[in-house]
């Protein structure tokens, strides 16, 4: 009897030792489901939230903004602190964005950031003298093309509603020239033009960095005299009020 008990106890101890020495097998290989979930999470993190125009308008000043827009026109390219920059007038179907001194290569400026080119812009919303703009901007070229037609804002002159069209490509019809003067008093720099409409005066500008002295519009505006009536096209820039950057003037024949 004692022998049987001893044998049983030895067997039990052997079983316990075997059990204690056995460890579960752990694999380092992730399952297909786990890999797919990780990839989806990474894509979600990398996905950029692009703002609508209304969201851009509602954004706080100095906050980061991301918009998709189309180049409409551009001022001269130059180097600032060794970095190439240019200022762009851009617009999509819902509104316009003024990109101030956005860094870009000369090659991109000449060959890619052309009228109609679609870009995604990341920068910071800022304001200067009433002009809302995007500064410290970076861009990504996208597929797509859009060139805006001038929207007639003549009936918006003198209204608070005009500001909601800021920076858009616009037309103002039947404007009477009151005064034309050159910045610094001589041709080559900006031209300041005061127009009258419905008893009020509005200061527009030929921006030399946009349309220089060798352009048709610069010469045409320089030849205007007080009393001339013209239709005007340009970008509804803002400087303490509407200060359209003129791109075209067309004389209105008196009847």
Residue ranges of predicted features:
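Repetitive helical segments and hydrophobic/amphipathic motifs
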Residues: 11-12
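Positively charged n-region of N-terminal signal peptides that target proteins for export
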Residues: 1-8
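Hydrophobic/aromatic hotspots within intrinsically disordered, low-complexity regions
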Residues: 25-26, 157
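Intrinsically disordered, low-complexity serine/threonine-rich repeat tracts
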Residues: 27-46
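Bacterial signal peptide processing site
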Residues: 21-23
């Amino acid at each position: 009897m004692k022998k049987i008990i001893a044998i049983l106890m030895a067997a039990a101890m052997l079983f316990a030792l075997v059990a204690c020495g056995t460890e579960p097998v752990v694999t380092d290989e992730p399952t297909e489901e786990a890999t797919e979930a990780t990839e989806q999470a990474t894509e979600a993190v990398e996905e950029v939230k692009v703002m609508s125009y209304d969201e851009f308008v509602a954004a706080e000043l100095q906050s980061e903004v991301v918009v998709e827009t189309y180049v409409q026109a551009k001022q001269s390219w130059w180097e600032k602190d060794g970095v190439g920059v240019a200022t762009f007038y851009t617009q999509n179907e819902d509104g316009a964005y003024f990109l101030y001194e956005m860094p870009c290569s000369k090659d991109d400026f000449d060959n890619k950031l052309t009228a109609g080119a679609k870009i995604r812009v990341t920068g910071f919303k800022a304001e200067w003298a009433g002009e809302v703009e995007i500064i410290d901007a970076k861009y990504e070229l996208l597929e797509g093309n859009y060139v805006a037609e001038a929207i007639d804002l003549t009936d918006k002159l003198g209204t608070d509603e005009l500001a909601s069209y800021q920076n858009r490509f616009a037309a103002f019809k039947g404007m009477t020239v009151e005064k034309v003067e050159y910045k610094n008093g001589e041709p080559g720099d900006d031209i300041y033009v005061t127009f009258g409409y419905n008893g009020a005066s509005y200061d527009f500008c030929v921006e030399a960095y946009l349309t220089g002295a060798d352009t048709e519009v610069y010469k045409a505006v320089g030849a205007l005299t007080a009393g001339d009536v013209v239709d005007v096209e340009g970008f509804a820039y803002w400087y303490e009020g509407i200060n359209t950057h003129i791109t075209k003037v067309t004389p209105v024949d008196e009847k």
